[in-house]
Amino acid sequence: MAKKSMKNRELKRQLTVAKFAKKRAELKATIVNVNASPEERFAAVVALQKQPRDASAARLRNRCRLTGRPHGVYRKFGLGRNMLRQAAMRGDVPGLVKASW
């Protein structure tokens, strides 16, 4: 189990990313726009750099919904490998069967 503080930190990052997503997209569009003047593009770069570090989606980490484990998380299910295995063995995941050949 991950510490509660780590789970809360990740939740806070998700909220920050959602809050700044629209503004970040506008600034990035201005930066790559070849028709914009160099001054406008530079101002957009500076404004993007002044945003909080956690506003970037690259800082998000996929975590298991049950345990908060940061590694071995399956995106499709949102569960860590251990919890996914337990859920599959209990039959909680429809269509998921143990491989045998």
Swiss-Prot record:
**GO biological process, any:** translation
Gene Ontology CC terms = cytoplasm; small ribosomal subunit
Tell me the GO molecular function terms: rRNA binding; structural constituent of ribosome
Respond yes or no to whether keyword Transmembrane helix is given for this record.
no
- The entry's keywords: Ribonucleoprotein, Ribosomal protein, RNA-binding, rRNA-binding
How it assembles, according to the record, is:
Part of the 30S ribosomal subunit. Contacts proteins S3 and S10.
Instruction: State the family it belongs to.
Output: Belongs to the universal ribosomal protein uS14 family.
Task of the protein:
Binds 16S rRNA, required for the assembly of 30S particles and may also be responsible for determining the conformation of the 16S rRNA at the A site.
Name of protein: Small ribosomal subunit protein uS14
| Gene coding for it | rpsN
